[in-house]
């Protein structure tokens, strides 16, 4: 049975990788990072650190990529050139002529993360040729870095040859409360055991799910901020890919306000002079 980590380079998956390095968890056969080609530089820096740290313990961190390229280029190419290739759907916010706000379909995770990883597992881990049947039964345990506060994200595998496992939920690891691991507890474990590293949130530069706080982090890097803003503008300026007039009439935006990203006021309440009665640092306990 092969043990493979779905490595997103975020807090939970980084902790699983390092717990395997320390022998707290079984030794992984490999960790797979699916590179969409549009992560912030701090994510790639952390990926490189993780690769070197895991290599000390004989665990390879493998980068897999979508065969057609990066998600940003694919989206822009479809939008501007109409070359007939398949549209890579980001869940952009949409503004209809009547002022109603919606959200587009989300297909990016499947196309640029799940599919490339499954192809790698079939070809490189199981040694299967394209369209060759996998052996019967579970061949791979695929670790998922999901903590108790986001347990609703824990989904079974659709492939019979692999099983999704959730060490923070199911494996009885000792945690500060003796039962389950929440995100803030995982952060505390990382700070105690690896105080010199900062684990970023792994998400595309132009991910529509960014909060204002996350957009402010992107804006600290002028090149990445310009990248996100120019993408936001290009999608509205050139998009003619919709299949009907109703969809073509809807403008698309990266920010939930349905305003151009350059024009959005990203300041926090404190920045605007509004006090707060509570510590707003998320402890990951609401389950959202």
Predicted regions and their residues:
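Nucleotide-activated chemistry modules centered on ATP-dependent adenylation/adenylyltransferase
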Residues: 1-288
């Amino acid at each position: 049975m092969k043990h493979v980590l779905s490595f997103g380079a975020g807090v939970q998956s980084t902790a699983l990788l390092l717990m395997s390095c320390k022998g707290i968890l079984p030794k992984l056969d490999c960790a797979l990072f699916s590179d969409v080609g549009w992560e912030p530089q701090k994510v790639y820096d952390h990926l490189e650190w993780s690769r070197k740290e895991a290599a000390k313990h004989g665990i390879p961190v493998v980068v897999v990529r979508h065969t057609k390229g990066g998600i940003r280029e694919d989206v822009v190419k479809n939008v501007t050139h109409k070359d007939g290739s398949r549209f890579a759907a980001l869940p952009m916010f949409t503004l209809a002529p009547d002022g109603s706000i919606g959200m587009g379909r989300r297909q990016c995770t499947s196309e640029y993360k799940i599919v490339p990883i499954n192809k790698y597992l079939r070809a490189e881990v199981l040694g299967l040729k394209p369209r060759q049947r996998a052996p019967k039964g579970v061949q791979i345990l695929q670790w998922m870095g999901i903590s108790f506060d986001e347990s609703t994200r824990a989904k079974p595998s659709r492939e019979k040859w692999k099983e999704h496992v959730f060490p923070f939920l199911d494996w009885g690891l000792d945690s500060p409360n003796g039962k389950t691991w929440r995100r803030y507890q995982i952060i505390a474990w990382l700070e105690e055991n690896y105080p010199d590293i900062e684990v970023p949130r792994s998400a595309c530069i132009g991910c529509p799910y960014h909060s204002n706080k996350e957009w402010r982090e992107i804006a600290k890097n002028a090149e990445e901020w310009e990248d996100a803003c120019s993408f936001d503008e290009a999608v509205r300026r050139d998009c003619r890919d919709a299949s009907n007039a109703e969809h073509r009439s809807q403008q698309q935006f990266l920010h939930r306000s349905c305003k151009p990203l350059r024009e959005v006021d990203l300041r926090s309440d404190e920045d605007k002079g509004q006090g707060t009665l509570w510590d707003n640092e998320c402890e990951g306990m609401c389950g959202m």
